[in-house]
Amino acid sequence: EQGMSAYCYTGSYQIPVHTLTDSIVKDIMMIQEIIGTGEIAISDHRSSQPTFEEFARVVADTRLGGVLSGKAGIVNVHLGDSPRCLDLIERVVDETEIPASQILPTHINRNEMLFGKSIEYALKGGAVDFTGNEDIDYWETICDEVRVCNGIKRMLDAGVNPDRMTISSDGQGSLPMYSSDGEFLGMGVGQSSCLLKEVKECVFKTEIPLEIAISTITSNPADILRLKGKGKVQEGYDADLCILDQKLQL
C-alpha cells in the first residue's frame, strides 16, 4: 500500500532455528515476506556450534520451502573468525545434492584467511557477500579486515564471476566497536548509507567499472535472492531509482 517492498529471513544465529510457525518450510511457504533463513552463524564463538547434520538440515528445509513457494529459499550464513571458515558450507555443497546457489555467506571480508577461502568458494560458483562499513579506514586499521574495494578487485583478478558478488550493510544492526588495541568499547549501529560509499571506493580507488561496482548492490542481490521486478532499470520493473552525479553523489 505504501509502495515499499520489504523482505526478511526466518531464524537467527542459532540452530535449532526460531520460526514463526512450527517449521522453516511453513514460514517460507505461508508468509509472503520470508524468502529464506538467516542469519545462521557458523565458525563463530557466538554460534550454537551446529553439527554438519544440523546445518545441512536447515539448508535442505530452506531449499524445500523455496521450491514449494517459488522463492529463492536462500540461507544467509554469518561467518566468524574461526579458522574453520566455510567448512560447513563446502561440505553441504560437496556431500549433498544441494547446490551452492542456496547459500549466501556474509562477512567474507572479515579477515584475510576467510577471504582467501571465499575466493576459492566463489571460483566454484558460490555467491559471496561483502560487509560494507561506514568508517572504512577504521576497520582496516584495527584488524586485518579486507577493504571491500580491494577484495572485489582481487576476486575479479582471480577470475570470479562479477555476478556472484554482493555488498550488504548490516544496516540498523548492532555493530561492535573496538579500540586500536582490540579492546571492546561498546555497540554502535550499522548504517545502510555505507553501500554507496563502498561503490564509490570501488570506482574511484580501485578503478572497477561502474557497471560491475553498482551491480553488487542492485542486480546481483536481486538475482541471487530472486526478487521479482527488482535490481534493474527495465520495462516492467519497479522504479526504485537513485539519481547520482558524476562523482556518484546522491
What are these regions (language model features)?
Residues 1, 244-250:
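Short, intrinsically disordered, charge-balanced linker/junction segments flanking boundaries
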